[in-house]
């Protein structure tokens, strides 16, 4: 498809020095690989953008794609490093970590992060639904054990 061809052309042009490997071009390349559903190449491109151009949003996108691809451990490594970031970026990392912990049925860790997110207005509703879900899950586990 078009995204795949676009990504191949852009990647080749950047490799040959015909186009600058600028942050904008690197981001476009990552987006094209995503559009082509070439997940490993998309992850690599976002990772490169995050490292070379110090872009936290790119690092966040890497974590999202890793989670989407079922690579929970790799995503968690990325997110743990980002969760202490101030503001919305840190909260987004915590939210993704909640999801990762839920994927692994690590309810205590998920609950702790969800409760932290409840303190922030724009995350309160989602975090509360996570807390309710986690409590329902752990109640079910406790009843089965009894």
Question: Where are the predicted features?
Answer:
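Extracytoplasmic and endomembrane cell-envelope/extracellular-matrix remodeling and assembly machinery
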Residues: 1-28, 40-41, 47
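Generic helix N-cap/helix-start motif at coil->alpha-helix transitions
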Residues: 2, 20-27, 52-61, 88-95, ...
């Amino acid at each position: 498809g078009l995204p795949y061809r676009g990504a191949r052309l852009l990647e080749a042009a950047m490799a040959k020095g015909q186009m600058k490997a600028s942050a904008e071009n690197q981001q476009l390349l990552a987006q094209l690989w995503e559009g082509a559903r070439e997940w490993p190449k998309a992850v690599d491109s976002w990772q490169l953008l995050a490292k070379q151009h110090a872009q936290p949003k790119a690092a966040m996108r890497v974590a999202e794609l890793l989670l989407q691809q079922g690579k929970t451990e790799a995503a968690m490594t990325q997110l743990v490093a980002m969760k202490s970031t101030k503001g919305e970026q840190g909260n987004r990392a915590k939210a993704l970590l909640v999801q990762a912990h839920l994927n692994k049925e690590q309810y205590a860790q998920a609950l702790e992060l969800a409760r932290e997110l409840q303190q922030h207005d724009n995350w309160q509703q989602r975090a509360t639904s996570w807390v309710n879900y986690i409590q329902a899950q752990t109640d079910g586990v406790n009843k089965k054990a009894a």
